From Swiss-Prot:
Gene3D superfamilies: 1.10.20.140, P-loop containing nucleotide triphosphate hydrolases (3.40.50.300)
Purpose of the protein: Catalyzes the transfer of a dimethylallyl group onto the adenine at position 37 in tRNAs that read codons beginning with uridine, leading to the formation of N6-(dimethylallyl)adenosine (i(6)A).
Entry's family note: Belongs to the IPP transferase family.
Protein name, UniProt field: tRNA dimethylallyltransferase
Species this chain originates from: Oceanobacillus iheyensis (strain DSM 14371 / CIP 107618 / JCM 11309 / KCTC 3954 / HTE831)
InterPro entries associated with the record: Dimethylallyltransferase, IPT, P-loop_NTPase
């Protein structure tokens, strides 16, 4: 019989972390972060990591495991997160994967086999040299020619994803979408997928308020510290919440412009997250309402209790 794994997904600022903690309390679980940026040490405010106080004694995994200058691919994330799931299950507890990084969560929950793809190190090195010497535009143009769907999802400055997409095409002859579809096999787990949504205007207000809170609690100081430690040009610093503040600190944008850009990018990201999870995964959706958040959480937990009881019978 497959072991049960729960995943809570949805857009940023919708309330996933709080539900995950309450769920872990109710069902003897532990939380595994499904956020691709929370793995980085020192990147706390901009990635909206839960604090020790907010964790309220619940064990959290996949947070603060590498430095901002270290490379951490989807395959790396999958390997580490699956080990966490095995560890939690091995101690008789319920793994609860919580986050909004769609591809990363999908890679963990399904049998993506990254090891089967042969990597041509010389080809990879050649692409890296082209970017270093000429910038990313030549490679981005090539990606638009061979895989326009993936090109629309990848920013030219995201060199790692740009190279990865071209690697897949070069070594398999498939687009990234085709490759991912081939890789998505049956899940090794009994999955319970819970999605949180919210009225768009309410969600966007929450996102704007979260950004203001990040600024008030020291995001600019956090980014300055990361720059002072030599991380400014690392891939991790291209994440939403960091690239915008870097533009301000470097003198390219006034503070209010940087904050507005951060809010706008976060809202657009939330929209992309919802699209991903609605199209890619068979999720049971629940609409959250901030004014009655406790009641909504209790409703979801009661629903889940029924599902788990039914499985055990």
């Amino acid at each position: 019989m497959k072991e049960t794994v729960i995943s809570i997904v949805g857009p940023t600022a919708v309330g996933k972390s709080l539900l995950g903690i309450e769920m872990a309390k109710r069902f003897n679980g532990e939380v595994i972060s499904g956020d691709s940026t929370q793995v980085y040490k020192g990147m706390d405010i901009g990635t909206a990591k839960v604090t020790k106080e907010e964790m309220d004694g619940i064990m959290h995994h996949m947070i603060d495991i590498i430095s901002p200058d270290e490379s951490f691919s989807v395959a790396d994330f999958q390997l580490h997160a699956k080990k966490c799931i095995d560890d939690v299950l091995g101690r008789g507890k319920l793994p609860i994967l919580v986050g909004g990084s769609g591809l990363y969560i999908q890679a963990v929950l399904y049998n993506y086999n990254f090891s089967e793809q042969r990597r041509d190190e010389s080809f990879t090195k050649k692409l890296e040299e082209i970017i270093e010497e000429e910038g990313p535009n030549q490679l981005y143009t090539r990606l638009k020619e061979v895989d326009p769907v993936q090109a629309a999802k990848v920013h030219p400055n995201n060199h790692r994803r740009l190279i990865r997409a071209l690697e897949v095409y070069e070594t398999t002859g498939m687009t990234m979408t085709e490759y991912q579809q081939q890789q998505q096999l049956e899940s090794p787990y009994h999955l319970i997928l819970i999605g949180l949504d919210m009225d768009r205007d309410v969600l966007y207000d929450r996102i704007n308020q979260r950004v203001d809170h990040m600024i008030d609690t020291g995001l600019i100081e956090e980014v300055r510290d990361l720059i002072d430690r030599g991380y400014e040009n690392c891939q991790s610093m291209h994440a939403i919440g960091y690239k915008e503040i870097i533009q301000h600190i470097s003198g390219n944008q006034p503070m209010e412009y940087a904050i507005d850009a951060l809010k706008q990018h976060s809202r657009k990201y939330a929209k992309r997250q919802l699209t991903w999870f609605r199209n890619k995964m068979n999720v049971q959706w629940y609409k959250m309402e901030p004014s009655i958040i406790d009641e909504k959480i209790e409703f979801i937990l009661n629903d889940l209790a029924g599902i788990l009881e039914e499985k055990s019978n």
